[in-house]
Amino acid sequence: MVVKLMIDFFLKSEYLPAGDQPKAIKEIENSILLGNKYQTLKGVTGSGKTFTIANIIKDLNRPALVVSHNKTLAAQLYREFKDFFPNNAVEYFVSYYDYYQPESYVPSKDLFIEKEATINTEIEIKRIRTVTSLAKRRDVIVVATVSSIYALGSPDFFKKSAREFFVGQKISIKEISDIFVELYYERTLMNLERDKFSIKGDIVEIWPSSEHGEFAYRICLDFDEIVEIYRVSSFSKKNLGATNSFTLFAKSYFVIPYENVLEAIPKISHDLSLQCQYFKDNGKLVEAERLKQRVEYDLEMLRETGFCSGIENYSKYLSGSTMERPYCLFDFFPKDXLLFVDESHVTLPQFRGMYNGDHSRKLNLVNFGFRLPAALENRPLKYDEFEALINQVVFVSATPGVEENEKSSVVVDQIIRPTGLVDPEIITRHSDGQMEDLYSEIQKRVALKERVLITTLTKKMSEDLTEYLVNLGVRAKYLHSELDTLERVEVISLLRKSEIDVIVGINLLREGLDIPEVSLVAILDADKVGFLRSTTSLIQTIGRAARNSNGLVIMYYDKISLAMREAIEETNRRRQIQIDYNKKNNITPKTIVKKIQNILEKELNNKNKNVGYDFEKIISGERLSKKKLIDKLKFDLEEAVNDERFEDAIVLRDKIKELSSKISIARNKKREV
């Protein structure tokens, strides 16, 4: 049995709560301590909502799940919490698919589409680390997406998979090997790889995904007794120090004891008979025969190997659960855990819609004899099931929706920013002559060495406007979905570094463009009714100019819409509160000074301490072979992309090119000699 580590949350920050943060922290904590289930933090852009959340977690000292509506924002939150809580377990749980084509059937074409998927190994590793941390300790913060409500294996089975190894333990190499295999690790006769183990004489090495850092465990035995355990670098094999013991968990969170497989087989067979009889009774002989062939093949594979393709469709039988819903990430948390729903006005509707889409696809598979009805239970949670799993929740948004406002016991405003910055002034201008007017406003900002964001309604408009501005001598680039992730990050980096002055985009909300150098946001066609010009979207877009003391928003329109009017009124309300507060407290707003750098060097330095070499020595090749140098950098590049650390990925990509070029030159010189 694993005894959970009881470590307090330690918040590392150069700053103390300021502005509206102390009041917001106190009010939300009081509401939670009173036992209220729902509370809302209504915080403007740049008010430090993440820092407020961090303080609540630290003060209440409870495990926390923070959910966001996309991977990019989740990755940003993950990095922030990693910085705030360096001594605690901060984990990342998002979809591990780079490509996913679900199993489906199109009746109109009599077309069955097999499941196809490409799994991202690094994301999968982070998911394993998440459930491992939750099994081992309480000081855990998990940043996740909608993946948190999708089906997982039994948390009890996973916790029971834990095996401890310690110095002085009486155990043979064969027994160790059998345990590793039971936990789904594979033996390798080649170089040690992640999630594999090797045996050389009396030495066993294993590299588990569940551990943070690129290190493996080396177990040294003498006459069926463990005499030494070391941590060693997975790449250089350098000894990183001795340890008395370590606990190993299964390499998968879908742990299925073989006895469960044996118990499931007769249940599956029984349901197969019932469903085949149902088809026959309704004249569906083709469906009955199809189902019989498919399921009987799966049963044979389960008998022989304990596994079959699409085994998740039999999770209802294999889990041993009597619940009507599947297990999910929430089940791995203790009962007193806290939930924070970031950007709740977007995230909650996303969670609400997951079940229906999944159900309609699988219903076709069941109705046409491709799957048993039990396959419907391998699914995301229904919204009411999601709500039932919530212990206590804080909705976080600058623009909370009706649901958050109606359910919450308290809705706490966080309007005053610690920096004293106020919401931007808003000017409305008719669209007649808007291009000339926009060009004039851009020139004013360029003269002040400030930046501009322009939002349009279509990709074509953004490209045409960018071309128009470039022809006028403006340093501008467009930003939209046809650019890949690294290209988008490069464009944003160019803006921050003053290599361009203007970005033209469509949905600038999703890009995470909180850039302090931006002092002007221009909204074209601000009056057009639709998602990108709703009250909520307009308020969020206005916030892009809220990190600069000269922040200004210009809305170009033909006729002022209701959404425009509501967004302007709400922004002006907040702006007046902020101005009054600054006057009362003699505060002069100052633009946020955000250092233009990436976190590559810091992360690499941390990794260097673990794996035993310096970044500079990686480049010069003083510690590792040339092949391993490039392999290591490629590994870091893949990890950076998976973590959404795209600026780091760009630097790593360039380093790989640089190193490859040096190796190529060295080879050519060698040939000449």
Swiss-Prot record:
Coiled-coil positions: none
Primary location group: cytoplasm
Annotated Gene Ontology cellular component terms: cytoplasm; excinuclease repair complex
Domain UVR intervals: 627-662
A Gene Ontology molecular function term of the record: excinuclease ABC activity
Record flagged with keyword ATP-binding: yes
Keywords associated with the record: ATP-binding, Cytoplasm, DNA damage, DNA excision, DNA repair, Excision nuclease, Nucleotide-binding, SOS response
Domain annotation Helicase C-terminal: ranges: 434-600
GO biological process: nucleotide-excision repair; SOS response
Keyword Nucleotidyltransferase: no
CDD domains for this protein: DEXHc_UvrB (cd17916), SF2_C_UvrB (cd18790)
Renumbered ranges of motif Beta-hairpin: 96-119
Signal peptide annotation: none
Residues annotated for ATP binding in this entry: G43, V44, T45, G46, S47, G48, K49, T50
Domain Helicase ATP-binding per the UniProt entry, residue ranges: 30-417
Subcellular location: Cytoplasm
Domain notes: The beta-hairpin motif is involved in DNA binding.
Purpose: The UvrABC repair system catalyzes the recognition and processing of DNA lesions. A damage recognition complex composed of 2 UvrA and 2 UvrB subunits scans DNA for abnormalities. Upon binding of the UvrA(2)B(2) complex to a putative damaged site, the DNA wraps around one UvrB monomer. DNA wrap is dependent on ATP binding by UvrB and probably causes local melting of the DNA helix, facilitating insertion of UvrB beta-hairpin between the DNA strands. Then UvrB probes one DNA strand for the presence of a lesion.
Family: Belongs to the UvrB family.
Oligomeric form and interacting partners: Forms a heterotetramer with UvrA during the search for lesions. Interacts with UvrC in an incision complex.
HAMAP family attached to this UniProt entry: UvrB
The name this protein goes by in its record: UvrABC system protein B
Organism from which the protein derives: Borreliella burgdorferi (strain ATCC 35210 / DSM 4680 / CIP 102532 / B31)
